[in-house]
Swiss-Prot record:
It is an enzyme of class 3 (hydrolase). GO terms for cellular component: cytoplasm; cytoskeleton. The gene is AC. Pfam families: Actin (PF00022). It is found in: Cytoplasm, Cytoskeleton. It comes from Chondrus crispus. This is Actin. GO terms for molecular function: ATP binding; hydrolase activity. Its EC number is 3.6.4.-. Actins are highly conserved proteins that are involved in various types of cell motility and are ubiquitously expressed in all eukaryotic cells. Essential component of cell cytoskeleton; plays an important role in cytoplasmic streaming, cell shape determination, cell division, organelle movement and extension growth. Keywords: ATP-binding, Cytoplasm, Cytoskeleton, Hydrolase, Nucleotide-binding. Belongs to the actin family. It catalyses: ATP + H2O = ADP + phosphate + H(+).
Amino acid sequence: MSKPAVVIDNGSGRCKTGIAGEDCPKAVFPAVIGKPKQKGIMVGTGQKDEYVGDAAMARRGVLIIKYPLEHGIVTNWDDMEKIWSHAFYSELRVDPQEHPVLLTEAPLNPKANRERMTQIMFESFNIPAFYVAIQAVLSLYASGRTSGIVLDSGDGVTHTVPIYEGYSLPHAVLRIDLAGRDLTGWMAKLLMQRGYSFTTSAELEIVRDVKQQLCFVAEDYEKELANASSNSSLEKEYELPDGQVITVEAERFQCPEALFKPELLGIEMDGMHLTAFNSIMKTDIDIRKDLYSNIVMSGGTTMFAGIASRVQKEIETLAPPSMKIKVIAPPERQYSVWIGGSILSSLSTFQQMWVSKTEYDEMGPSVVHRKCF
């Protein structure tokens, strides 16, 4: 392998991509495909049938915005291929035939999803070698630990993966399909109760921005709620693209609260703190202490202010009183999956782990289950 690997952190919301060995992704773009709602009539203005990534976001007012990945699972393979092709040719400007590729995936994904990824990479892009890594494991690499439990929450999936001395504990891996995109939908609902309506795919992108700019996690939800009704110190204004100003108040912490109380969305699931706790309880009694003291947060949905101290507080309530609990939230955590991939694929000991083109030709797509864990 003469050329360095290309690392693609295949998120449901944003695709992070770059060259192995670098310390941050070279390009981060929305994992979206935009298709025009109406027919183009002005000749020569160079309209296209579809736009990818930032180009789609820039023209979102006239496009239908679609995400090919939902809850970490690819729902439209043709669109997914366009996103990868955009990553290789437009963002990184590399020829995929010359570089091994490391892709990331959420744990407990259907096996067929992984096989199809492998097939497209080898057959459409003709890459020399391939590997699929679990997102949370890479985040642990990036944090420089070999033991810990990773609480990763992105746009499509929230999952907890306990790892001890470098071994993953697959029986204790848990996943909830509640993450950033669900929070955006919930925020749109909360804003609707205030009298602001956001319905189209482009308007939901505005809601996502409101969520990212203004939301925070309350340390004590009930107290914050009582506080919000009595004074208006929480009020913040947000200017929409057309110049109107909307005001948000209690919505700022009601939105991310759904991570801890999925019943707000009418979903029967455990919140993220309980999922992490259950994950720890599924592991062997001897290693729980190490996991409690190394709870590593990663992913874009863990970027809310106040989330680390809230997770700490919630887990302290659940765990035995004498247990020391430490939540680690690195500042670069929205890219830590990519950073971990960059570290992993540039290790000399990793080079024998790649699935090579020859192996793929001999065994077909199922080879990926044998070599990638």
